[in-house]
Amino acid sequence: MSVLPRYLLPDNSEVDETGRLSIAGCDLIDLAMEHNTPLFVYDEDHMRARCQEAVAAFPDGVAYATKAFLCKAMAQLAYEEGMDLDVATGGELHVALEADVPADRLIFHGNNKSMRELVAAIDAGVGTIVIDSRTEIAKLQSILAASDRTVRVMIRVNPGIEAHTHEFLQTGATDSKFGISIDGGLAKKAVDQVRSIPALDLVGVHAHVGSQVFEASSFARAVEVLADFIAQIDVPALSIGGGLGVPYVEGEAAPTITEWGRAISTALAGTGLRVKMHAEPGRAIVARAAVTLYTAGTIKEIPGVRTYVSVDGGMSDNPRPVLYGSGYEVFLARATSADRTLEVRLVGKHCESGDVIVRDGSVPGDLQLGDILATPVTGAYGHTMGSNYNMVLRPPVVFAKGGDARLVVRRETYEDLLARDLG
């Protein structure tokens, strides 16, 4: 097995002469000793650079998809770098507002927004609400009936594109819980319905073909399909959503944000349509910015079968392998550049046989109990999809920058586990 590919590490990663890895000047083993493990370590300047790249790639407007990773510090960072924020629940809306992101810089998504969530968004002054169904149109009409307010809205449509990704990550196909299908005239009926309501200001159309998509052609095809629809309804803006994939394991490759934006702009120019083009990257901003640190607690060799390495985290801090069969790499923080000769299965501490972090991984042959193991590219959909299964404590998050590590989310305590328990 080869050494860990450096392109899977955060931008500001350095390996010293002994093989120890630092991120933004912060030694990972030192961070593990200070904060214990599991621990998420983010390269702050990496995320800022990706935000800046996204703003440049989509000058008409770009929003950070907070579902990928959200805390107050992340919301502030994305806003400071010129991005709007895409929120999809009342909780994400609340965190963004608590981070002092102006409400008019928020785009409110979700396929089943409750009346309470819609009222909260409207009262806060959210910039745009993305309508996901005709049911939602009726909800908005009811809320605004006795008001003189006008709400900016987009309509999420399904272009009928089946992107090459995991079934659970396909969101633009006709058979999807999200959006309103263009086929059969359903989206056109929704447009007509919105335009019949004076309180709703239709400013564009939104679509999302899927997540973890490696082929820019999927997005280009969506633009072509959507352009035909937009030409019929005459709206000023099109949002292509997010979904740009990132490499997680050796051998994978994906377009950069700049290349993604260029492919979409080229496709739009080819249609002859003159509209503003928006996008909503999330994973592409944060995934490679972080690594997760664990401590090796058990090494179990089954002769002729495999070696299991159990760590102090698992599906509670990274459920993606269980949900999607996602692959990850693993390495030793003290020997980042070492040849990985020992084949292992990295597993968590939960009471589930499926609690696997890295199914077919490799580490240096001198792995020892107590070693700090790291999995790269864990900045997206780890922290936000985490849980308290088995009543484990959710890990802390640090932002590393210029040799300083700032604790932005503390580790939970046992008292936190009982905070909602009324006995």
Predicted regions and their residues:
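General structural feature for long, well-ordered alpha-helical segments within catalytic domains
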Residues: 27, 43-46, 50, 54, ...
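Charged (often Lys/Glu-rich) extended helix/loop segments that serve as interaction or gating elements
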Residues: 274-423
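Structural preference for beta-strand elements that scaffold enzyme active sites
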Residues: 61-63, 82-84, 105-107, 128, ...
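A generic secondary-structure signal marking the coil-to-beta-strand transition
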Residues: 11, 19, 38, 60-62, ...
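Short glycine-/acidic-enriched loop or helix-start segments at secondary-structure transitions
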Residues: 74-75, 96-97, 118, 140-141, ...
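A charged N-terminal "starter" segment
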Residues: 1-152, 188, 195-201, 403-423
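Active-site loop/helix belt of alpha/beta enzymes
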Residues: 2-3, 143, 160-300, 363, ...
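Active-site beta-loop-alpha junctions enriched in small/polar residues
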Residues: 46, 67-71, 88-92, 111-113, ...
